[in-house]
């Protein structure tokens, strides 16, 4: 896997535009020159989420603000002591979502992977705005995906090292190898700091019985594949869960050479439905 990193040095240039900025502000500006937005990956992913076309998708950016040029950045990098707020929009037009994702600079972009009720379009119709409310679990129309978030263990709010990232990707590939039905019915990629798998379900009803099946499946996978290096997140079963949008940047902490910001990727997908989740 090719990983793009970036190092910024300003010590020998008093007039450099990054001088006088905080470390976080430097990281935000550095994010402008980190791996760019991959619209093709975003489009492929959105097509997977919305086949068949059902409801809408929420896109969300956390602790963010819009600068004077219209870019969406970290709130604490805009200045004025503002820590940022939740910015969100609901989309039934994939191209409009991609157009909004192009505005992100040094912030992570997330989407809901299960279809949400179309009524939510009335909050922010195919555009990003400051949001007081976001998609709730009971706004989800059906359980379309089982989400495996495979992350290397590390301190909170920092990006992974290359070694940590490779460990997570190797664990993902082991899961796909042990469960070929996941590869046949799922999609997978790199989350920027770890790896992910989405397993396509048969649009289960969004009820407690079927939600419990997802919880049990994640617990079983966690028991089999988690250790003191990589873990399977068991908290991803809630219907309104978010996933990093492929093609966008995962920007945790500061953009350092040893823990760089990286792009979320979509590396493969199958075409079948997995319909064998059973209790016990």
Question: Residues of each region from the PLM?
Answer:
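Signature for HUH/AEP ssDNA processing cores
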Residues: 6-10, 16, 21-193, 200-220
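N-terminal compositionally biased, intrinsically disordered segments and leader/signal-like regions
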Residues: 5-6, 11, 266, 272
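Catalytic "initiation/cleavage/transfer" segments centered on a nucleophilic residue
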Residues: 228-280
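A common structural junction motif
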Residues: 218-229
């Amino acid at each position: 896997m090719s990983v793009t990193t970036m190092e910024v040095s300003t010590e020998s240039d008093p007039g450099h535009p990054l001088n006088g900025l905080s470390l976080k502000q430097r990281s935000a500006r550095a994010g402008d020159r980190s791996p760019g937005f991959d619209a093709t990956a975003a489009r492929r992913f959105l097509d997977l989420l919305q086949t068949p076309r059902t409801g809408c998708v929420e896109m969300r950016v956390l602790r963010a603000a819009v600068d004077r040029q219209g870019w969406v950045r970290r709130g604490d990098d805009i200045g004025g002591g503002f820590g940022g707020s939740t910015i969100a929009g609901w989309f039934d037009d994939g191209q409009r979502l991609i157009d909004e994702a192009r505005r992100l600079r040094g912030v992570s972009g997330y989407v809901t992977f299960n279809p949400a009720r179309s009524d939510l379009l009335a909050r922010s119709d195919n555009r990003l705005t400051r949001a007081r409310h976001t998609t709730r679990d009971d706004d989800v129309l059906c359980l379309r995906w089982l989400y495996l978030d495979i992350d290397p263990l590390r301190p909170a709010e920092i990006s992974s090292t290359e070694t940590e990232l490779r460990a997570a990707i190797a664990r993902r590939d082991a899961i796909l190898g042990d469960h070929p039905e996941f590869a046949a019915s799922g999609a997978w990629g790199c989350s920027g700091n770890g790896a992910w798998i989405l397993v396509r379900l048969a649009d289960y009803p969004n009820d407690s019985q079927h939600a419990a099946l997802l919880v049990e499946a994640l617990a079983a996978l966690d028991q089999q594949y988690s250790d003191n290096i990589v873990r399977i997140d068991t908290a991803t079963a809630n219907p309104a869960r978010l996933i990093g949008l492929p093609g966008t940047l995962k920007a945790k902490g500061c953009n350092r050479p040893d823990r760089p910001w990286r792009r979320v990727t979509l590396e493969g997908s199958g075409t079948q439905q997995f319909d064998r989740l059973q209790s016990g």
